[in-house]
Amino acid sequence: MLEINLSPIYYRTGLNSPVPFPGLPANASAYAHQLQTYCAVTRTRNYPQVSTWCQTCELAQTCPVAQLQPLPQHGTLCITNSAVTGGGKTLAAYAYGVQHCLTGDKVLGVYPTNELLHDQKRAICQLFQTIHKRPPTEGIDGELLVVDGEFLRQEKDAGEQNIKLIEYILKRAKIVLTNPDILYLLCHHLYASSRELTGRTITAFSILIRDFRTIIFDEFHLYNSKQQAAVLWLVGLSAQLFSTVETPHPHSFIFSSATPLTEPEFAEKLAALNALGVSTVTIQQPGEFQGRPVMEAVKLRLESANLRAWQGEEKAIEFLPELQTVLHQNPHHRCLYVMDAVAAARRLKQELTQLFNPEDVGEAHGFVRPEEKRQALRKRHTTGTSGIEVGIDFTGDYFKDILLFEARTSAQFLQRLGRIGRNGREGGENIAIAIVPPEVLNCLLEYPQLPQPFDRTHLPMLIEYGFRYFNPEGFVGYLEHYAPLEAEYTSQIYLKGFEYGKNPVSGEWEETQERRLTRNQLNQLIQTLYPGHNRQTARQALRKLLANGTISGILGFRDGGGVVEANIYRAIGGKRENGKPLNADFSPLFNLEIPYFDYAKSQQAQTFPFHRYSLTYLLRRTHCRFITQAEFLDYLQPYNHYPETPTYLKQLAQANPMNYAIVYGDLPKPRRWHFHTNSGQYRWVKQGIKQKRDYPILDKVRRISGLSIELEKTEAALDIDILNQALEKRDAIAYIGKGNAFRYAIETHLPPLFELCPFRWGASEAQYYLAFDLNAFFLSSLDSINPACII
């Protein structure tokens, strides 16, 4: 055990600055990073005005914003704000945009989780109220709109396409909050499935870039390499494609992150865009010893458990009687429990209901519905997983001051610790218990004696040192191997929006000057971001992925590429030598999200016991039974009058699930199972004759079929045959490697909860592992070989 008393972090107030920062309560003043971010955005709109502010501002001598040169009308400024957690980054990012959104300067906010999306809406509404003295109008025709998958399903009329709705929203709303998935679908034209919708997609994207001059990416340090590539492409497009379009102001991209962006690959590529008119500025404010407390004092305790063997759950349960005593002595405390696994969070909830009033205990994770999560966050005890660690402010109704959490990496540790102590109190009593790997605790115990209290501004360096052998793989190879292919696909679809013209002299149909200019701009952007690539090399690689049926693995996300695959092939066109469409012989893809009926919840009055969750989790951790669609709909029929039912039916129709289940409860111990196939894989040999292999093609991304599930112990009640019948009708985009999945994950430092499944081939006892969809390409990007061989 190691105890550390963390000192508060303060930010100075009352700075001598003429900057008219908006949105502050009476008798309050802005922090340095807030003034600097506001000035940076204002500089892109009114450079002379900001220059006069610098003349009398006490920050001017050391302020990075003061060094910025004027941007051209079509320039782009990228602002990175790395102020500490709880330091007011949301206010800094949105102050200018909310102040001017009613006069044509629209704002787009992008959040990595839907929980954070709805949580931050509260803060932005408060800011709007403070600035404009009234709340923003909300809804489809309002000034502020949250656009996620649930909203699109609710608002879309029967038969209407999402892109039509998005186009309508972008024209009317002043502030739009969304998630990276919807932005990715829009910017990569994946809503396009016909000539009409291709045109609408391009129009919607053009409206986005033309009208939304401030684009904010919150919690940017959580973005993986694919998401970073998408952001780089968007920044490049804003500077390149719209350099000749009449727009009133340059763009401002704000990357808000409590952790300084240390990924050199992203920073290098962002710097490379300087050649296209993109400027960058980094704003940091680490903390001071006087002013307003932005992070309160915390009594931190580190305990160890073998997290690789999932022993954090048992360790957390050991601490519950101790917490019960603390809460008995101090009834005002409220507790948050953040675990890695859903099963651990559910088990913890069950244990807590034995010690405390069950009405005071809630769970917020992927196994419960969104409205139930929001209710759970208000309870005295809230258990959850990674979804609640991302930027949610546990203040106000969500207030918590005791935290028990697991941490497998330094980023997890710092992110989760930052959930409490954000209320600006002097003398607040905050307690945090961190369960870390034994190696980390032993390393920190050997560290020279730590001063007490410990300066919290030095904590990141200490924690990163302790976790230095546990830092997860970042898959930076994806940026070089596969991001250029995403860019090429987008370029091809975008160019479909430009007509060919008839030469009045020759009478031949030729490329118009506008299309030629756009084509050259796209090629220059790909070459700038990805040296060594151009549209020709990327096109050749893209054709391979289209032909072998794996393209939706990189253009899809989360649930896989099954939802967008049909759109991809309809939009890109192309046929094989036999005249068939490229995807004519493909079966539908796996969708590992399974709709299920929660039997235990159905016994509770006024609850809607239907949800969706990962097939691999249901197999591993639940007492369940697989059923047919007809049986599932029979269970759903008595709930037809519930308000949740129409939305749930829309989700089912869109997802095209491959199977259904009933969940009766949690298993006391994980079930052991693996994927299996007897199907041979084929490849062409030099003589042009197909040759059957009795072992899988390893270390490649392939489209495979014939997968089934095998259990190590037979369970007739599971009805696994129903599941396997559905699997037989599906294809999967997969990467197959040889070896033990658990050992490989440790050796390669895969991120926590990276989905890697055990796999068997035929009658062989050899161990293999599978990764599906985007994860398959992530593993492929680890191979330091010729990219052409990877594909």
Predicted regions: what they are:
Residues M1-I791:
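N-terminal helicase ATP-binding lobe
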